[in-house]
Amino acid sequence: MPQQELEQKIAENLRLYRTLHGFTQAQLAECLSYSDKSVSKWERGEATPDIGILYTLSEIYGVTVSELIGQTEKSKETQEKLKAVEKDRKALERAKKKALERAKRQKKKK
């Protein structure tokens, strides 16, 4: 895998696993004793964490470093969690849309 493609895959996975585990960038940064700007750069592919940080992240997320950097398939458990998160995200999006529609109707009634 070319270097740039690998770095982008790492960035995507870092963001994916962080959100899957419910951390904000600031919370994760605090756990790692790094700045939230560093975490943001990692997730945008502008920088890559060193192997020590990747190892720590793999322990936090309960995955291998290989999974974290996209070199092996995600485990079945991780895939199931991802599906559940996506389902929840869609449900939240629908609820948000309904709430906005209700608010608009209420505003029109006034």
PLM regions: where:
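A short, Lys/Arg-rich alpha-helix, primarily the initiator
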Residues: 1-20
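Residue-level detection of the helix-turn-helix DNA-binding "recognition helix"
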Residues: 19, 33, 44-46, 73
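A secondary-structure capping/hinge motif
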Residues: 38, 45-48
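Short, charged recognition helix plus adjacent turn
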Residues: 70-106
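DNA major-groove recognition helix of helix-turn-helix/homeodomain DNA-binding modules
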Residues: 52-67
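Short alpha-helical DNA-recognition segment
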Residues: 22-41, 56
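Residue-level signal for the short linker/turn that defines the boundary of a DNA-recognition helix
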Residues: 12, 22-23, 49-52
